[in-house]
Amino acid sequence: MTIISFREWMKQYDLGTTVKETPIPIETIEAIESAKLVVTSDQRRAVQSAAELLDSLSFVQNPLFREAEVPTSFYAPKWLKCKPNVWMFIGRTRWIVGYSKEVESYKEVRERARQAANILHRYALVHGHIALVGHSYFNAMIGTELRAMGWYGSPIFHRKPWGCITYTFHEAMDGNVLNTKLI
């Protein structure tokens, strides 16, 4: 697809609905079932995923957890055709090095990830086990911030739908173990 087709594809992707093409892994189901609080962004796909996982709408939606957008307003020759994942890579790479036309800058998204990690930390202090149903790239950024705050969890994120990573925080003062699941 050309860059123009990719721009349209991204718009349609954002407006689309989730399709359960792959079964939900048991670890993800267990993470949701053990959570005392489930949080998601307000983006359509995340809300649909949370509703599918919970079979209800009993979760907190917060725009702070929205995915980091990929810039698509960059020049590419009209004859150049790439697969969507290649255009995503090009857009994401340009974004990381400073190109952010029409989207939040990398620096702004990193700050938002820091804020999101702080909110998740506070939710975990209150509720113990929590789950975030979110978006792969932004979840990875939140994971980086959680690890910087002393949480333990894998720096490797699942690229497949319905993947789950568990972060654990051992509170030294009273021996509490808090868990956050990023899905």
Predicted regions and their residues:
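Short amphipathic alpha-helical segments
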Residues: 50-52, 143-146
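Glycine-rich phosphate-binding loop signature in dinucleotide/nucleotide-binding domains
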Residues: 31-33, 120-128
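Domain-level recognition of soluble alpha/beta enzyme cores
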Residues: 4-7, 147-175
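Short, active-site-adjacent cap segments at secondary-structure transitions
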Residues: 46-47, 138-140
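Beta-strand elements within well-structured catalytic alpha/beta cores of enzymes
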Residues: 39-40, 124, 128-137
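Active-site-proximal alpha-helix that buttresses catalytic centers in soluble enzyme cores
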Residues: 1-64, 82-94, 101-114, 168-170
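Short alpha-helix plus adjacent loop in nuclease-associated cores
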Residues: 66-81
